[in-house]
Amino acid sequence: GNGWIKIETLEGIYERLKENKNNLNILCGDFNTPKEEDLKNGMVSFAQRIDDKGEAKVRKSFRGGEGVRWDKGERGIIVGLKEFGIEDSFRKLFSYDVKDYSWRFNRKDNVIKRRFDHFFASEKIKVIDIKYLHNDKKISDHSPLFTRYEI
């Protein structure tokens, strides 16, 4: 990826939405994060590793910088926007009970699936339906995200 440019971008998006938190906001796209999502840890950033007990721990350093800053950059968007009334619409409807993906790749005999594409919306925007449309035709390496909502 683009290393720290990604984190600087996520930090900038977070600050911009913080300034505009009283507006109706929609933020959607490919964020290339998180690394994992599960019932125990919720969101797991790329700066975290899962220990022997299954708990996510932030690495001291990551990709030539502080792991804490990287984790905060990813976490600020994926779960932190809730502080401004902007939520991940997929998780709002399904919590962490439902696993899905928008991107996948094969590594040897292992298929890795990640939910990199997101739709975030202000609380006043009611999401009625949201789903990833998986298609074998591979127009893109990501699955489109269909979202229906009302204001």
What are these regions (language model features)?
Residues 1-151:
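Active-site regions of metal-assisted phosphoester/phosphodiester hydrolases
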